Amino acid sequence: MTKKLFLFSLLCIFSIISTFSFMINSKQKGSAEKIIPATSTQYNNKWLTHRLIKMDYDNGTAFSVIQKAWNNTEHFILSAREKCQSATTTLDFLYCTNALLGDMFPYKESNMVSPAYASQFSDCDLNVYLLIDAAKESGRQIEIIFAPFHAFISYIDDNNVRAYWETTANNNKGTVADLNDNHWYQKTFNKFYYVPRSENYIESLYPVLIANSVDSAHKKEIYNNLKPEIKKTPLAYDLYYSMKNEISSQDAEQINLLLREDITSSDKQLLLTGYFIKNGNTE
């Protein structure tokens, strides 16, 4: 394949991915159906959402936003425990809690948890964080699975079979996941995706997810403090190369190799396309 054809292929793939992103964004809904009352909720270290919110605070988010986010997440978690306690299976529990989530937190994309939870909206991965806490509060365990541009739930059902739940369907009220749906569950060769992950893993990965929402100094600090296993994820590679002032020929070769597995990465595709254009190397 010539470089010109390769460049054209990258642009076509990026166009397709941009279309997927637009379709995801089009799910955004209006205001929440249930307004959460304001209280002076305290930080609760046992909840994943509260720990992630605190990480936002450590990265410069205003405390007024942090306080409201803590309040709203606690209200949801305790409401879910009260209203969904009669659920006899994890599936029933997810139907109940996700419906409640959709009422309190309509769908809207956000990299950081705090501004989203504080303003009563949520997206795919933020939904999972809320439901992990609600499940744990009710003595159940669920996990997150990352897909390209998406995240959903995995759990072991009452028959000891792994099952999957899509949190964003039905106006953010959820339904059983159909992994054959290529719109949500895009195919990729990278082994980071489609593996159940624990809340500890989420905490380790979260700084990468918010890196584009902080200043450049914090971004470098975030990358330098990542655990070695997280630095090997496709998202961390995107972060690493995005911080470089200039992509070298060696960088371009490495990005090209990474794209063989991480075929859905629009960041890597754009970096490589930019490199070829800048160097006038399209033949």
Model-derived features: positions:
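Positively charged n-region of N-terminal signal peptides that target proteins for export
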Residues: 1-5
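Intrinsically disordered, low-complexity segments enriched in polar/charged small residues
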Residues: 8-9, 23
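A structural boundary/capping signal
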Residues: 22-283
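Bacterial N-terminal signal peptides
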Residues: 9-16
